[in-house]
């Protein structure tokens, strides 16, 4: 059985979408404790590389989880347009298709099952086998992922032997197992030094994938080699700026300055 059954089946010669369009229509999310993670937001995201910046608690993670279907909006709607198909990431009927379409990266978090495997190659193999990917395809994909993400020399090492930098890379590899069209990444370089950040960022943006990611690293989003197309600045669960990365960083700097002046 190939990796894309149904909507994105490779057996019916339907290719993986080159990109998707996320649409939020008056979407909001309120947590059980009453805190609003995202206020009513109307937004369309279809650029190749979109950065989301903001202070802790500004709503970045809430927004990304609404995009990848981990959260369902309290009000309003979130949809994903992939070719001629429209999916609702928070709905039960579209959940499997959304999981095939979107790869989720959460910092350096990897599935718990990876720590029970003898080594990371076997961990990736088991992860794909559980999703009914054929053996030949699994082996080809494992080799490709490990090479692309500079993990080949670690293939026979257990996950808990990896340093933080390579766990970040392994988290990306895990997210790519189903050959998704888009990666939604929450702080994919968090906690790394300058060298580690550059290594992970180069690997992430070298992939032939649409990427929506949250970060505190304003230098990274303006580096020309990463070709970030667009940046959103969030504050208090609201989008305060939507435009070029350079202008977003300026808006972010001004926001922090105003907060300090009020303190």
Question: Where in this protein do the model-derived segments appear?
Answer:
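Helix-to-loop junction immediately C-terminal to a conserved catalytic motif
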Residues: 68
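ABC ATPase NBD Q-loop/coupling interface
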Residues: 77-97
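Q-loop/switch helix immediately C-terminal to the Walker
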Residues: 108, 115-130
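Conserved ABC ATPase "signature" region
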Residues: 125, 137-154
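Conserved ABC ATPase signature
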Residues: 158-162
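Hydrophobic anchor residue at the start of the ABC signature
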Residues: 172
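Catalytic Walker B motif of ABC-type/P-loop ATPase nucleotide-binding domains
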Residues: 183-187
């Amino acid at each position: 059985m190939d990796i894309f059954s149904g909507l994105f089946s490779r057996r019916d010669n339907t290719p993986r979408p080159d990109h998707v369009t996320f649409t939020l229509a008056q979407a909001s999310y309120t947590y059980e404790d009453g805190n609003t993670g995202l206020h009513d937001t109307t937004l369309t995201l279809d650029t190749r590389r979109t950065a989301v910046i903001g202070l802790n608690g500004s709503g970045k993670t809430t927004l990304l989880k609404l995009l990848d279907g981990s959260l369902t909006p309290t009000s309003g709607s979130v949809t994903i347009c992939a070719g001629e198909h429209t999916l609702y990431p928070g709905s039960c009927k579209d959940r499997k298709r959304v999981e095939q379409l979107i790869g989720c990266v959460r910092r350096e978090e990897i599935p718990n099952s990876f720590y029970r495997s003898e080594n990371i190659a076997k961990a990736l193999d088991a992860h794909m086998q559980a999703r009914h990917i054929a053996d030949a395809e699994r082996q080809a994909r494992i080799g490709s992922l490990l090479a692309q993400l500079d993990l080949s020399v670690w293939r026979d090492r257990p996950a808990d032997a990896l340093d933080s930098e390579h766990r970040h890379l392994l988290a990306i590899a895990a997210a790519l197992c189903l050959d998704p069209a888009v990666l939604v990444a929450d702080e994919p370089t968090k906690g790394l030094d300058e060298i580690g950040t550059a290594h992970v960022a180069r690997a992430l943006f070298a992939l032939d994938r649409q990427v929506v990611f949250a970060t505190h690293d304003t230098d990274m989003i303006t580096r020309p080699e990463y070709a970030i197309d667009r940046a959103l600045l969030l504050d208090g669960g609201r989008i305060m700026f939507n435009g070029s990365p350079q202008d977003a960083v300026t808006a972010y700097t001004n926001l922090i300055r105003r907060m300090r002046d009020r303190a």
